Amino acid sequence: MKKNSPLVSIIIPCYNASYYIKEVLESVHQQTYPEIECIIINDGSTDTTLDIITNFKNSHFHIYSQENKGLSDTRNFGLEKASGDFVFFCDSDDILPATAIESLVTPYTGQENIIIGKTANYSWETKKIISYLPHLDEKQFFENKNSEILTLNIIKNLSPIAQNKLYKTEFLKEQNLKFLSGIYHEDELWFFETIFKAENVLFIPDVTYYYTTDNSHSITKNHNDKNLYGYLSVIETIYNKYYLQFPQREIIAYYIAHLKKITIGNLKNHSNYSNEALQQMESTFKKVNPEFKKNINLKNIEKQYFIYVNMLSLKDSATIKKEYFNNPVNSLRKWFKILMFSIFNKK
């Protein structure tokens, strides 16, 4: 690898992206950093996506087409084809600022496994930035010896998207990191696994990604049983593959509770989950019941909150909804319960 000019492989999976993909590819074409290759995979599109990407002329663009396999398998295919020193994932409806890759590569010192930029929520229709995903305001480097970034994510609720992160290819290969096939919310698991195993991670304050928020076909807009099953698969995988196998059980336990909180939170606006899916949630939550210890870098009230969330998750789905949402003073009541639980456990 050339330290000052490493090759970056930008991986773009495409499925029925004809409305967006030309502008996305233009944003890659306009990158100020010259050492890039773009791997574009048509994942069985039924619209004109393949025609558009085939007609886009750029010697650095490598185009592949396959039967529909889903996002995880398509990204994994991109990883197999990537020849860069780094890989960068971009969705087929998102935009890269012209200096995105240059901003991510420039601070590389030779030791970072992952470099993370700031993500802007972007309206495709108005071409304006709406807001920003949670991020660190200043440039910050982590050796991550005690999984500090997982703790940071629990506190700050950092976005777990796979995009807008420069991953060192050697690191991904050494750790045999791939996306779990056949589930929704594969990014949640990918974020956990990559951050858990990374030794050196750099956050930079530069905006290096425009994340489209008004695509009605995004899975964040379409909530059904697969959505719930996806979260449950992530929780079970982390529990079985990491909590039961690695010594860092304390942080993993709290991270599982963090994911349970997200899963429970989705119940409020997505009440159309089937009874079978809710029963599966109850079964998974009861099976995944980690032990919580307090020698972790969280404030006591935060620890008690996640312990409370885990306790709540062991109840039936109707009780979970009632406890978490139905009372108009839910927020005050919830924090009162946490406070009382904290006081009780000090005695």
Language model features with spans:
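Catalytic core of nucleotide-sugar-dependent glycosyltransferases
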Residues: 206-215, 221-250, 262-265, 269-292
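Membrane-interface aromatic/basic loop that binds lipid-linked glycans or pyrophosphate carriers
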Residues: 271-347
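Donor-binding/catalytic cores of nucleotide-activated saccharide
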Residues: 71-72, 92-204, 209-226
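N-proximal low-complexity "stem/linker" segments adjacent to membrane-targeting elements
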Residues: 1-29
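Acidic helix N-cap motif at the loop->helix transition within catalytic regions
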Residues: 19-22, 36, 47-55, 95, ...
